[in-house]
């Protein structure tokens, strides 16, 4: 699972996902990509599940780039705990994704293989996405 090696602070505010993504919304490395159409928190487990699904489908052919990284800690309180006594402990990591953000890129394979692999990865995502081609 992806997570930062070290962070400046253990806990973060939740924040809010307003507007569209201005960073990371163009294809940089591959030829085909999966682009987010909705805002969401995508967990490191979901990112890994999508990456595995794509690599399994493409087998040895092609190369895959993961364009998002989970750098936001999500804290969870223990069950059956009363309110108060501080914030919960960090449980998992998420990536804040806004509409327009490229999630995965793929290159070195035919369009049919890339489309099928990216569709499988899209099913692992908690948001609506679209398949995009460079150029």
UniProtKB/Swiss-Prot annotation:
Keyword Nucleotide-binding in annotation: no
Gene for this chain: rpl16
GO molecular function terms attached to this record: rRNA binding; structural constituent of ribosome
GO CC, alphabetical: chloroplast; mitochondrial large ribosomal subunit
Protein name as annotated: Large ribosomal subunit protein uL16c
Organism: Drimys granadensis
Pfam families: Ribosomal_L16
The family this protein is said to belong to: Belongs to the universal ribosomal protein uL16 family.
Alphabetical UniProt keywords: Chloroplast, Plastid, Ribonucleoprotein, Ribosomal protein
Principal cellular location given in the protein's record: plastid
Subcellular location: Plastid, Chloroplast
């Amino acid at each position: 699972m992806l997570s930062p090696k070290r962070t400046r602070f253990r806990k973060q505010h939740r924040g809010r996902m307003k507007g569209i993504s201005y960073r990371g919304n163009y294809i940089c490395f591959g030829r085909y990509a999966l682009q987010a159409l909705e805002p969401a928190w995508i967990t490191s487990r979901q990112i890994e599940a999508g990456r595995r699904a794509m690599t399994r489908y493409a087998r040895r052919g092609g190369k895959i780039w993961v364009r998002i990284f989970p750098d936001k800690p999500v804290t969870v309180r223990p069950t059956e705990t009363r309110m108060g006594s501080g914030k919960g402990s960090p449980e998992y990591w998420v990536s804040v994704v806004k509409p327009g953000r490229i999630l995965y890129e793929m290159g070195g394979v035919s369009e049919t293989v890339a489309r099928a692999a990216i569709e499988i990865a899209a099913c692992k995502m908690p948001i609506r996405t679209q398949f995009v081609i460079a150029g």
